[in-house]
């Protein structure tokens, strides 16, 4: 990760001209970031502020997708597989099955190490933080935990209210955008529906748990009819909302843990 600061500097120079790519979709990712912002500890919030300045987690959550339009090899080749995981039906996740560049799980591990490394540069830590927020969101989208046979639903052609698209896009953005809400409106509505008990219950920092939840949900969302409209949206809206809420709570939980003072971590292990 030492050379990522160079790519970050290049990336920032292109940022204003880039149109968002889809992965959860920009609204979905911003929702998870906004929910996370509300659940950060004081220590985590201070560290995020040091790295991101006026940029909040809602904005940071979409940045790795924004950078997919950068033609540099880092974004087109190296970082491309970090948005998803492939686990074939009936298999367990094995990091050894990831591409040479890694996948979302291995990238999360590496970026976590960078964020906790006192010798890492601010640019490398900033890149790591943005990717951590984004990757945790992606791991909660069931089709970012694809089975390896249809590119995470991208090859499953469907019609969404008569418009040709694919199943991956339906889950990334179409079902969310159907509500015609801004990310802040949707995040506020979802946040108000999260009970204190759910915040405690969902406070899980294990990526394997998140991944297995997505795989279990993946099995239930493939339609028998390619013409999707109100029935499909109604059937799966609660599941989609839950994944967004889970992701937001867990982004915060993960960052609270990463930024927790070393002495506090040590005390918890005694």
Predicted regions and their residues:
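Positively charged n-region of N-terminal signal peptides that target proteins for export
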Residues: 1-5
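Bacterial N-terminal signal peptides
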Residues: 6-17
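N-terminal, motif-rich segments that launch catalysis or mediate targeting to/interaction with membranes
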Residues: 22-135, 142-270
């Amino acid at each position: 990760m030492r050379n990522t600061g160079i790519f970050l500097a290049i990336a920032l120079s292109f940022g204003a001209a880039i149109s968002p790519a889809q992965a959860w979709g920009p609204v979905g990712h911003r929702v998870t970031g906004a929910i996370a912002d509300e659940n950060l500890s004081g220590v985590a919030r201070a560290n995020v502020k040091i790295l991101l300045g006026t940029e909040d987690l809602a904005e940071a959550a979409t940045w790795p997708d924004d950078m997919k339009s950068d033609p540099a090899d880092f974004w087109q080749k190296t970082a491309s597989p970090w948005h998803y995981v492939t686990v074939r039906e009936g298999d367990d996740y094995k990091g050894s099955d990831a591409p040479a560049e890694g996948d979302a799980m291995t990238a999360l591990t590496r970026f976590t190490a960078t964020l906790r490394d006192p010798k890492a540069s601010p640019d490398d830590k900033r890149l790591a933080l943005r990717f951590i927020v984004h990757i945790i969101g992606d791991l909660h989208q069931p089709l970012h935990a694809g089975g390896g046979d249809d590119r995470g639903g991208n090859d499953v052609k469907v019609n969404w209210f008569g418009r040709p698209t694919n199943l991956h896009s339906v889950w990334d953005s179409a079902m969310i955008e159907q509500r015609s809400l801004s990310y802040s409106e949707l995040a506020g509505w979802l946040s108000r529906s999260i009970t204190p008990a759910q915040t405690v219950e969902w406070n899980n920092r294990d990526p394997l748990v998140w991944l297995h939840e997505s795989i279990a949900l993946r099995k239930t969302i493939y339609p028998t009819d390619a013409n999707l409209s109100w029935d499909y949206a109604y059937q799966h809206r609660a599941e989609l909302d839950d994944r967004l809420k889970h992701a937001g709570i867990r982004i915060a939980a993960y960052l609270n843990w990463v930024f927790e003072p070393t002495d506090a971590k040590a005390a918890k292990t005694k």
